[in-house]
């Protein structure tokens, strides 16, 4: 008799500092623009103010987009939900996952975050990046266990040439 494994779904959302990491250059540029536009008798201060305001709207949209991102790891699938005005949901079957990678940019190292990349045999989503994961989370081990159980449940065995 085959043993049945039931795990609760894991929901992962990017850490809010990932927004600062991704958009630091635009945050600085917008701040400098507003400061410059506030200077009396500055050349083109109205234009700089309008551009800074538009950049602020763009940053607000990107912040909402990042906050609405959600990764769900279930027993059978890895689900990625994203979008603001146009919502999309990408599904990846766990038994198709073939490899993992953890990486950190310099800024992610400063804020103790990482990006976990998941590679699969899926045609539409061969690589899925889970961004803004806290360093203390051992996500790869958790996903690897679920992948192995999913493959065992479906009697899928990997054959390698060595």
Features from the language model and the residues they span:
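N-terminal basic, Ser/Thr-rich segments that initiate or prime the first beta/alpha elements at protein or domain
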Residues: 1-162
